[in-house]
């Protein structure tokens, strides 16, 4: 199944963007070529940009604390798997502790490292990181791959608590919903929300329907899923077919 996700608010949108960026960082960090490690470094810059737009650390701590308080009373419920519950609460508490021990904001990493700041200022310019622009960076790229990787890991380490906290919140959110089979009649589906508040919509599409692309939108009253196809020039065009998919609405 192919999963498409749509966030209902800016906070979840930010967490999804961070998740995507951290996954990208993992991939390029595991590669060997200097250009791939260049992408890893610029991805760290993007993570700092996204995380620095709001007081994300405080928001994550508040949300994790709210989830911990909601789960704590379940310890006396015999119908709940207590081992699984304790594991989740322990993970939440570890996330809160890691975030609480993090000093400063995400952007502090750049403020404390002039060398990285110089790379970032050039990286926003097309072709701005050539060897004649940043000879020290060019020399660094010729180091052994393991040495470069160790440096990047060191620079990314201050962001680990944000990744941990965001990952816990997103996993709990995704596990909060139940999926149901629906059909987009004539390529379109809409559903009244009846006053219920959601934070994330998931659309699961069978891989045999890869040609159909869901475009999702929502407000506090209704959600829409409209399927399109791309023509030879990759332009979207409407679909008239009935398309089955799984819909999952998630909310804490």
Swiss-Prot record:
Q: Tell me which Gene Ontology terms the entry assigns under biological process.
A: division septum assembly; FtsZ-dependent cytokinesis
| Any single Gene Ontology cellular-component annotation | cytoplasm
Keywords per UniProt: Cell cycle, Cell division, Cytoplasm, Septation
Question: What compartments host this protein?
Answer: Cytoplasm
Q: How does it assemble?
A: Interacts with FtsZ.
Q: Which family does it belong to?
A: Belongs to the ZapD family.
Primary role: Cell division factor that enhances FtsZ-ring assembly. Directly interacts with FtsZ and promotes bundling of FtsZ protofilaments, with a reduction in FtsZ GTPase activity.
Q: Which HAMAP family match?
A: ZapD (MF_01092)
Protein name in the entry: Cell division protein ZapD
């Amino acid at each position: 199944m192919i999963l498409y996700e749509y966030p209902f608010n800016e906070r979840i949108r930010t967490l999804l963007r961070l998740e995507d960026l951290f996954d990208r960082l993992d991939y390029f960090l595991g590669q060997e070529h200097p250009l791939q490690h260049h992408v890893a470094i610029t991805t760290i810059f993007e993570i700092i940009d996204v995380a620095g737009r709001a007081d994300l650390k405080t928001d994550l701590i508040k949300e994790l604390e709210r989830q911990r308080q909601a789960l704590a009373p379940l310890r006396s419920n015999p119908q709940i798997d207590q081992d699984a519950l304790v594991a989740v609460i322990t993970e939440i508490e570890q996330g809160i502790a890691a975030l609480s021990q993090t000093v400063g904001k995400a952007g502090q990493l750049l403020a404390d490292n002039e060398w990285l700041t110089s790379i970032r200022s050039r990286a926003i310019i097309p072709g701005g990181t050539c060897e004649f622009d940043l000879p020290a960076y060019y020399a660094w790229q010729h180091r052994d791959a393991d040495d470069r990787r160790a440096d990047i890991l060191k620079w990314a380490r201050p962001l680990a608590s944000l990744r941990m906290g965001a990952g816990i919140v997103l996993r709990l959110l995704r596990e909060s919903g139940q999926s149901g089979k629906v059909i987009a009649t004539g390529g379109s589906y809409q559903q009244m929300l009846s006053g219920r508040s959601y934070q994330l919509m998931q659309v699961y599409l069978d891989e045999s329907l890869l040609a159909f692309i869901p475009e999702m939108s929502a407000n506090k009253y209704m959600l829409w899923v409209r399927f399109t196809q791309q023509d030879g020039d990759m332009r979207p065009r409407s679909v008239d077919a009935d398309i089955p998919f799984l819909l999952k609405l998630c909310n804490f």
